[in-house]
Amino acid sequence: FPAMPLSSLFANAVLRAQHLHQLAADTYKEFERAYIPEGQRYSIQNAQAAFCFSETIPAPTGKDEAQQRSDVELLRFSLLLIQSWLGPVQFLSRVFTNSLVFGTSDRVYEKLKDLEEGIQALMRELEDGSPRPGQVLKQTYDKFDTNMRSDDALLKNYGLLSCFKKDLHKAETYLRVMKCRRFVESSCAF
């Protein structure tokens, strides 16, 4: 992220977050289609919902709550969400060795790093260049399990992909709320 106007920094961060969220959603669907019998999907989704680590972060749960928070707070939450996945996604490509969707998986880590840098650039701009130490995650997500012949591994990966999709949706929402608050545009209705 070279020096550029704040509006461009926000636009780039939102585009990166949207792309990552779409990639996470596509991956989740591809995994579900390949490994989870249709009759089990709903019950497994409900069981997995309680296991997202990000639920322990006191972050807003939707657009309305996000609008009550400052931009710096939303950037910090977004950064925490992104950083919590940097380790686990490095194992993602090994899980999907034969998948068309995951021809792009090797780049997921780079895309997350890109977004992390973009969020950090926004934080520097909004905090007058003096970033304060934020919350550091003492715990993060487990790595994806590469043993796809085990039911436990399948369920673990399914749950992780569900959380990955949810967390990227949150980060995208926070970035869009901030962008819309600062730069009213026609694309702000979501």
UniProtKB/Swiss-Prot annotation:
GO terms for cellular component: extracellular space. Keywords: Disulfide bond, Hormone, Metal-binding, Phosphoprotein, Secreted, Zinc. The keyword Metal-binding applies. GO terms for molecular function: growth factor activity; growth hormone receptor binding; hormone activity; metal ion binding. Pfam families: Hormone_1. The keyword RNA-binding does not apply. Disulfide bonds join 52-163, 180-188. Zn(2+) binds at residues 19, 172. One of its GO terms (biological process) is animal organ development. It is found in: Secreted. It comes from the Eukaryota. The modification Phosphoserine is found at residue 105. Belongs to the somatotropin/prolactin family. Plays an important role in growth control. Its major role in stimulating body growth is to stimulate the liver and other tissues to secrete IGF1. It stimulates both the differentiation and proliferation of myoblasts. It also stimulates amino acid uptake and protein synthesis in muscle and other tissues. This is Somatotropin.
